């Protein structure tokens, strides 16, 4: 029988199962309803016949048994799929555990870790279970015959202890290159192939069997029971990896089923702290850890605990109301709607759109302010600081002036008093001859005209008045 025929029969079987499921539920519900009504009428005394009541009771029992059996069968046949989902969840839990170790700068040991080794052993047990059953149904041939040497190495059992794997016998010095998480992912892929092969062989045997063989059916359910037990063991590995000792409740399982598409699991601060402390303890047992690494890891663990909010505050949403003052004006003013609380007067603002003339004037004044008046708002503060600095440096100024007069007097060979008289005479002579006249005053209009294109506003009276108000006194600039 070729592959196309097998797929066609599988599709036909699926269609028949979908079409007959509603019919089975309808028959079971009808039988249960008739039996319940008959028993109720018999108890009330309206029916005196005992035989119909007994038959109705038997029908009720049979209908209930069929319904429970159908539900149990439906749950058991999904064991393989649930086991694959549990393997993926366990892999995500182990990966999350490694992320916690990395977050506190602690390397999670890749070799001989109990959780990952336990997961690998359980996966190999599931593969062996499916391989054994496939051989019994397929004349001793399985996909195992196509194993490569690498796959045979990671799937083989130890010769010393059959509960251990062969890769666990590798010495620790040679085991640094062995990543057991990658081995676990490879084993999951191998199990998926064996599960597909086992499902195909079981369906072909049931379809080609001329008579109903109860032995094969019982063997099939026995295999599913073994796989279900392995699934529960993998679930315990997941809880151990995430430090969740209790099983999920019914509502939590529903939420977990809705969130199963998430790649990473959410952990609380307690689980993160427990994993971080366990990582520190494992590194302390090794000889390669230093005191600075442990101190840094403890500090990062403290930050994890401190970052958890004790009482999370609800986020206040701000309602925004958009109002248009004028239909012709495209400018929009955004106003935040309050929550009924008292608003200070300083917090109330009224915005009005600018006209075209105001915009032009504002742009020109902005250019002028950037060119000439930059930093003028802090001139008063700067003047105050400058005055304080002069007072502090006044003793140094007097001392330097005294030392300068002493040096000049020594250079000219005269007394300091005579040197002061000579300086006064030279000053008076310069004033009389006109050499000591003050230079031309600074013309700021010319400087403004030569600056960045603001000569159009150089003769503006408002602009000149504003400059005059911002002028600094000469006694400050000394």
Curated annotation (Swiss-Prot):
Residues 1-24, 74-478 are cytoplasmic. The keyword Hydrolase does not apply. Residues 46-52 are extracellular. GO terms for biological process: chromosome localization to nuclear envelope involved in homologous chromosome segregation; embryo development ending in birth or egg hatching; homologous chromosome pairing at meiosis; microtubule cytoskeleton organization; vulval development. The chain crosses the membrane at residues 25-45, 53-73. Changing residue 130 to F: In oj35; reduces growth rate and results in vulval defects. Produces dead eggs at a restrictive temperature. Defective cell division and cytokinesis during embryogenesis. It is a multi-pass membrane protein. Keywords: Membrane, Mitochondrion, Mitochondrion outer membrane, Transmembrane, Transmembrane helix. In the first mitotic division in embryos, required for mitotic spindle alignment and asymmetric cell division. Required for motor-driven chromosome movement and homolog searching within the nucleus, and subsequently ensures homologous chromosome pairing during the prophase stage of meiosis. This is Spindle defective protein 3. It comes from Caenorhabditis elegans. The gene is spd-3.
